[in-house]
From Swiss-Prot:
Residues given in the record as substrate binding sites: 68, 94, 198-200, 298, 326-328, 348-350
UniProt enzyme class: isomerase
Note: Part of a large, functionally divergent protein family. Protein modeling and substrate docking were used to predict the substrate specificity, prior to biochemical analysis.
SUPFAM superfamilies registered for this protein in UniProt: Enolase C-terminal domain-like, Enolase N-terminal domain-like
A Pfam family of this chain: MR_MLE_N
Family: Belongs to the mandelate racemase/muconate lactonizing enzyme family.
Superkingdom of this protein's organism: Bacteria
Recorded catalytic activity of this chain's protein: L-alanyl-L-glutamate = L-alanyl-D-glutamate
Keywords for this protein: Cell wall biogenesis/degradation, Isomerase, Magnesium, Metal-binding
Amino acids binding Mg(2+): 224, 251, 276
GO molecular function: L-Ala-D/L-Glu epimerase activity; magnesium ion binding; racemase and epimerase activity
Protein name: L-Ala-D/L-Glu epimerase
Organism: Bacteroides thetaiotaomicron (strain ATCC 29148 / DSM 2079 / JCM 5827 / CCUG 10774 / NCTC 10582 / VPI-5482 / E50)
Length: 383
């Protein structure tokens, strides 16, 4: 039987709200509930393959700092005892990774030194040690390993973490910065399919964007300013105006370098304020308490599911709210992030809906709500 005991010690499960101490989270002392492991032989080697894959966007995607029609991506597969786990690295421009850098990183990863994939903590600690950055590349390995381990366990990760799939949140659907006519068309297209929208702001036409959407729908809106507001009084005034327009939360209102100004805004804000660019990994979470109401966790920034789950647990232990977000991704990474979505307050997991060449079928959005399946691992099948 695979290394069940060691795996259960390191899967980092915690029952949210159970009084887990911050020190326990950081020390990795949170335990998963026991679960049956399918019978597979021991002694085989893990084999990893990877290849570039360009994601094609359905619409031109514009935020405060750039526009694009494609997103570079690298697909990863890890095979063990005839079972394959899938992962991916998505690389939007601001992340600072490229297909070349991801491929070069993955070439350095030697999984054959480990006897089986249930040494998840040791394997991913080794992967993390190979460079100080390359978070999307690390996430690709992490996701594929989690998918593989879940398949060997015969269970989806939401069950391994002890979560209730009926408690998944609605996901936002993102409307990028565009002309009023295009914004109206996009809003009409998605207004009947989603319960909450997300709008990218941070330019001179912010109010026009909101008014344009409000001419079509009164759905709740989450706003991502993408660090676009530089003056704290202006940011606070905008937030008060946005609250009057039915906005329910604000993401990264100001540049990450202006943490004191962000804290000033958050303390007076009538809406919850979430960190995005100010947050990357587990070590950043505690420092943001007080400056933000909550955090937005993205697998491509935090190295994957292992660290994301620790961040969820730590944020709750600190009394912070949690959002799970994404890049433009296939259903592989979206389904991976969805596994812990029952434990979060907000979800922005629409990245797979923004592309026209998804390689996978996985998590679905039904009546605007994230709907998990019971496929083992991260819950995906290749199309």
């Amino acid at each position: 039987m695979p290394n069940r005991r060691d795996f259960l010690k390191t899967a980092a499960f915690a029952t949210l709200g159970s009084g887990i101490a911050v020190s326990q989270v950081l020390a990795g002392e949170c335990m998963p509930s026991a679960i049956h492991i399918n019978k597979y032989g021991i002694g085989g080697k893990m084999k990893m393959t990877f290849f570039p894959y360009e994601l094609k966007l359905r619409h031109v995607f514009t935020v405060a700092t750039y526009s694009r029609t494609t997103t570079p991506d690298v697909q990863v597969e890890i095979e063990y005892e005839g079972v394959t786990g899938y992962g991916e690295a998505s690389m939007p421009p601001y992340l600072g990774e490229t297909v070349e850098s991801v491929m070069n990183f993955l070439k350095k990863v030697n999984l054959e030194q480990f006897s089986d994939p249930f040494q998840l903590e040791d394997i991913l600690s080794y992967v993390d040690s190979l460079s100080p950055k390359d978070t999307a590349a690390k996430a690709a390995v992490d996701i594929a390993l989690h998918d593989l381990v879940g398949k060997l366990l015969g269970a989806p990760w939401y069950k391994i973490w002890g979560l209730n799939k009926e408690k998944t949140p609605s996901t936002t659907f993102t409307i990028g910065i565009d002309t009023p006519d295009v914004v109206r068309a996009k809003t009409k297209e998605c207004a009947g399919l989603f319960n909450i929208l997300k709008v990218k702001l941070g330019r001179d036409n912010d109010k026009e964007m909101i008014e344009t959407i409000r001419s079509v729908t009164d759905l709740p809106i989450a706003v991502d300013a993408n660090q676009g507001w530089k003056d704290r009084q202006y940011a606070l005034d905008m937030i008060h105006w946005l609250k009057e327009k039915g906005i329910v939360m604000i993401e990264q209102p100001m540049p990450k370098e202006q943490l004191d100004d962000i804290a000033w805004v958050t303390q007076q804000s009538p809406l919850p304020v979430f960190a995005d660019e100010s947050l990357q990994r587990l070590g950043d979470v505690a420092a943001l308490k007080g400056a933000f109401t909550g955090i937005n966790i993205k697998l491509m920034k935090c190295t994957g599911m292992r660290e994301a789950w620790k961040m969820v647990t730590l944020a709750h232990a600190l009394g912070m709210r949690v959002m799970v977000g994404c890049m433009t991704e296939t259903s592989c990474a979206i389904s991976a992030a969805s596994q812990f979505s029952p434990a979060v307050d907000f979800a922005d997991l629409d990245g797979n809906l923004l592309i026209s060449n998804d390689r996978f079928k996985g998590v679905e959005v039904v009546n605007g709500k994230i709907t998990l399946n019971d496929l083992p691992g991260i819950g995906v099948m290749k199309i």
